[in-house]
Each structure stands twice: as structure tokens, then as C-alpha cells.
UniProtKB/Swiss-Prot annotation:
Belongs to the gamma type-C retroviral envelope protein family. HERV class-I FRD env subfamily. One of its GO terms (biological process) is syncytium formation by plasma membrane fusion. PANTHER family: SYNCYTIN-2, VIRAL ENVELOPE PROTEIN. The gene is ERVFRD-1. A motif (CXXC) lies at residues 43-46. This is Syncytin-2. The CKS-17 immunosuppressive domain is present in many retroviral envelope proteins. As a synthetic peptide, it inhibits immune function in vitro and in vivo.
Length: 538
């Protein structure tokens, strides 16, 4: 009876219980309903959290190539034979940095973010860079590229760079040339690519339109009223709507195509003429790498996804968006994991003993390429964030150990160098004795330690976010699973203590009343039977 009362009391509470992940599931279902999807009811939204399952990449449309913004990062190296021109070279380098738009202050972190991603669909534009000594970032097959633009790696052309402190104007490398298969691009009037300033002020001729500028059209755009045009002077793409006139401004400060072509240059050298002749003196060389500034966009190179491309990169890449491998399964399909049913009913269709691994949905935009959003289960995201933080922290500790070993080795080498110089002091030192150039090691451990410190800060930030956001629910589930076996006995004892005296009193009164009724009946029987015996004729 106590168990029956317990079930009657707890059934409404269990029916009204709502797991916190129901909100994510409801949002996903509402998103399906708002898009008119036939799977808005009676279906499962699933995605795999396994690292072996490849993700999906969706190429950006031709028009999105004109709006996605990039940023540049410059690192430089002085020429060893600079000598007395160091002051002028430093002034020139400062001017070059000022004239470059949208310079990234923090050094980018290179390397693939994901390495097992499949491109879905055909990319309208791909960029290929081929250098024997380049850094390979991955190569897309030509079958998934509609138009492939190839960056010429052998270009060695220069242009004068205005600087009033030099007697002869310095020379500056021009942007690399872009080649493409004959007949893939269409010639258009020059007016469509002239007068297109960028959204930021720049004095660098790499980003300024020329007086005469050939304009080429990227074919196979969905709308006949819209064009995507290639500016070969600045290696930039423009979106053109023929119904709105020719003077349509460029949106990004540095376009993604311009950043990709500039980053293919290796040791771009600035040189100045010493005399009126043809001899030149090199001042400094600089590396330019590029990153995507627009959030959510990535470089898709083969099966690798990158946020930044290093200097002298090689491979075939496009740009696009990334999502996990998400699928929609019909409701009658047997799934390998338990998951929740319809959220509008108070009862649960399947047993709640595991939360969903991951729930999400990516909606492709009007061009069929953009991703509107991805929803994830809270608990899985929390665990993933913790794992990433732990991996970053472990990597930082490993880098610290390696750097300490390098510092120790450098100290030993320098000590040996001093000893050899002392032994060969009569000959002018070890370098003069060997008749070779002297090489000195420059310790970069400070920069490495700064990067390690940044990695540790990122790890601590991820751990704090995971703890603050999701630890309460995780702790609640652990506490609930521990207390649940004792809930039944505790509730039964509580009910017994609350209602036991009342029930005992009722039982006592009932027994007492029955006893009194029995005694009264017995007295009546004693009185009635003697009288009946006296009146009997027998």
C-alpha cells in the first residue's frame, strides 16, 4: 500500500520533469518547422561525435568571395649586408607597414583545424599555388572546382615605391600574376573594375586601381543580372549588378583572393638603387601570411580546414563553411542510442538514461552554401571543451620542456664556441682560422615562452567556461544518480511518519468499535435465551 501511495505521489512529478537538453531539442524542432521541413515531426536529429566520422564543408558562393574579408600579417628580416642604410631601411619598413591595410598584430597560429572533412558540392572558385619549396596545406581535386585561378610563383617584377628619403626610389615587388585556363573567363568593359576603392584607406599600389584595368567575368553565376568580376591589377573580385550602375564600391578592406595571392610570395625583397646604374642593394625581406577575418569562414584545402595560410603556401584551396556530419533520421528508424521523443507530451517515449550525444542543424543560405547555425548538446560540448583545454595545457608543457632543452643545448654550444675562440685567438678566432663566415645564434626563447603563456591562458579560459557553464548540471546528475536508490525507502518512511498515527488511530477505533459491538451482542443473547426457555412448552 505504501508503494502504491509513493507511485501516486511521484507520477505527476516525473511526468512534469524536463531535462535541460529539451530546450536545445525544441529549438531544433522549431527551426525545422519554420523552414517547412517534412521532418519537423516524427524524426531524429543526429550527428556523430566520433573523430573518425568526417565533417562536411560547404563552398562559398561566387558573390561571397567578394564579401569575405581577410587580414595580413607581416614578418621581416634585415639584409645581412645592409651596413649604413639601416636607418633609411627602418624608415622605409615603417612606411610599408602603414601603407598595408588591415595588418594583424598577433602572429597567427598555422596548421589545419580539421583534417577529415569532405567538400559537399562544387566550389565556384579555387586558387592554386605551386612552389617546390612551399608549405603544402592540402589540394582539392580539379573535379570539385568550377574555375581554378593559378598563382604564378616565378614572377620577379618590381615597381617603384615612393619614399622621399632615398636619392633613388626603392623598388617593391608587384603582386603575383594570376593565370587561368583559356576560355574560362570572359572579357568585360574596363569601367566595371575602375574606380573601386577599398573600404579602408591605403597608399599601397597593390590595392589601388590602375589607370587601365582589364576586367574579366567569372562565368556560371545563377543570376544573369549579376556578375562577379576579376580585377587582375589588385587580384580582387567585385560583385556587379547590372541594374544598379557601374560605380559599386568594394566592401572588404582586403579581399580573400588578394590575401591568398600575396601570401604565396616568399621572401619578397625591397631594394634600392645605389647609383644611377642597374646595381641595387637589398634592404630587407618580409613574409606575408593571411588569415580570414570573417567569422565562420575557413580555407578548405583538400580534406584540411585552415583559418590562416602561411607564407609560401602551396596547394589548391577554396573558401567555405564547416559543420559536423549531421543527418535527419525518420522516427521509425532504430537508433543505436536512446534519445527523446516528442517534447509536447508529458510522458517520455523512451527510457531516460543517457542524454543526447549531439543535436544540431545547418541551414544552407539562399546561394545554397552558407550555414545558418549549429546546435549542440550541452553536456557533450562541456566534455569536448574540457578535453581541448587539457590537450592545450599538455601541449604547452611539452613545448616548455623542448624549449628548456634547446636553451641548455644553446648554452653548451656557446660555451664551446668561446673555448674554441680562446684556443685560436692567435689566428683571430675560429672563424678567421677556418676562413668562413661567423654565425651567431639569436635566442628566440622569449617569444616561445610568450606563446606558451598564451596557450596556458587559453586552456584556463576554456576550463573556466566549461566549469561555469555546465558543472552545475553535471554535479546535479551525479548527486541525483547517487540519491535515487534511497528515494523510495526515504519517501515511504516519511509517508509512514506522516500518516502512520492517523492510520493507527483509525484502526484502533475500528477494532474498539467492533469489540464493543460484539460484547453488546453477547449480552443481548444472554438475556434473550433464558426467557425463551421458560416459555417453551417442552
Amino acid at each position: 500500500m505504501g508503494l502504491l501511495l509513493l507511485l501516486l505521489i511521484l507520477t505527476p512529478l516525473l511526468a512534469a520533469y524536463c531535462h535541460p537538453d529539451f530546450r536545445l531539442l525544441e529549438k531544433a524542432q522549431q527551426l525545422l518547422q519554420s523552414t517547412g521541413s517534412p521532418y519537423s515531426t516524427n524524426c531524429w536529429l543526429c550527428t556523430s561525435s566520433s573523430s573518425k566520422t568526417p565533417g562536411r564543408a560547404y563552398p562559398a558562393s561566387s558573390r561571397e568571395w567578394t564579401t569575405i574579408e581577410a587580414e595580413l600579417h607581416i614578418s621581416y628580416q634585415w639584409d645581412p649586408n645592409l651596413k649604413g642604410l639601416i636607418r633609411l631601411a627602418n624608415s622605409l619598413l615603417s612606411k610599408v607597414k602603414q601603407d598595408f591595410p588591415d595588418i594583424r598584430k598577433e602572429p597567427p597560429i598555422f596548421g589545419p583545424i580539421f583534417t577529415n572533412v569532405n567538400l559537399i558540392g562544387i566550389a565556384p572558385i579555387c586558387v592554386t599555388a605551386k612552389r617546390k619549396d612551399g608549405t603544402n596545406v592540402g589540394t582539392l581535386p580539379s573535379t570539385v572546382c568550377n574555375v581554378t585561378l593559378t598563382v604564378d610563383p616565378n614572377q620577379q617584377t618590381y615597381q617603384k615605391y615612393a619614399h622621399n628619403q632615398f636619392h633613388h626610389q626603392p623598388r617593391f615587388p608587384k603582386p603575383p600574376n594570376i593565370t587561368f585556363p583559356q576560355g574560362t573567363l570572359l572579357d568585360k568593359s574596363t569601367r566595371f573594375c575602375q574606380g573601386r576603392p577599398s573600404s579602408c584607406s591605403t597608399r599601397n599600389f597593390w590595392f589601388q586601381p590602375a589607370d587601365y584595368n582589364q576586367c574579366l567575368q567569372i562565368p556560371n553565376l545563377s543570376s544573369t543580372a549579376e556578375w562577379v568580376l576579376l580585377d587582375q591589377t589588385r587580384n580582387s573580385l567585385f560583385w556587379e549588378n547590372k541594374t544598379k550602375g557601374a560605380n559599386q564600391s568594394q566592401t572588404p578592406c582586403v579581399q580573400v583572393l588578394a590575401g591568398m595571392t600575396i601570401a604565396t610570395s616568399y621572401l619578397s625583397t625591397s631594394a634600392v638603387s645605389e647609383f644611377s646604374g642597374t646595381s641595387v642593394t637589398s634592404l630587407f625581406s618580409f613574409h606575408i601570411s593571411t588569415c580570414l577575418k570573417t567569422q565562420g569562414a575557413f580555407y578548405i584545402c583538400g580534406q584540411s580546414i585552415h583559418q590562416c595560410l602561411p607564407t609560401n603556401w602551396t596547394g589548391t584551396c577554396t573558401i567555405g563553411y564547416v559543420s559536423p556530419d549531421i543527418f535527419i533520421a525518420p522516427g521509425n528508424l532504430s537508433l543505436p542510442i536512446p534519445i527523446y521523443g516528442n517534447f509536447h507530451f508529458p510522458r517520455v517515449k523512451r527510457a531516460i538514461h543517457l542524454i543526447p550525444l549531439l543535436v544540431g542543424l545547418g541551414i544552407v543560405g539562399s546561394a545554397g552554401t552558407g550555414i545558418a547555425g549549429i546546435a549542440k548538446a550541452s553536456f557533450t560540448y562541456s566534455q569536448l571543451s574540457k578535453e581541448i583545454a587539457n590537450n592545450i595545457e599538455a601541449m604547452a608543457k611539452t613545448l616548455t620542456t623542448v624549449q628548456e632543452q634547446i636553451d641548455s643545448l644553446a648554452a653548451v654550444v656557446l660555451q664551446n664556441r668561446r673555448g674554441l675562440d680562446m684556443l685560436t685567438a692567435a689566428q683571430g678566432g675560429i672563424c678567421l682560422a677556418l676562413d668562413e663566415k661567423c654565425c651567431f645564434w639569436v635566442n628566440q626563447s622569449g617569444k616561445v615562452q610568450d606563446n606558451i603563456r598564451q596557450l596556458l591562458n587559453r586552456a584556463s579560459t576554456l576550463q573556466e567556461q566549461a566549469t561555469q557553464g555546465w558543472l552545475n548540471w553535471e554535479g546535479t546528475w551525479k548527486w541525483f544518480s547517487w540519491v535515487l536508490p534511497f528515494t523510495g525507502p526515504l519517501v515511504s518512511l516519511l509517508l509512514l511518519l506522516l500518516f502512520g498515527p492517523c492510520l493507527l488511530n483509525l484502526i484502533t477505533q475500528f477494532v474498539s468499535s467492533r469489540l464493543q459491538a460484539t460484547k453488546l451482542q453477547m449480552k443481548l443473547n444472554k438475556r434473550v435465551h433464558p426467557r425463551n426457555s421458560q416459555e417453551s412448552p417442552f
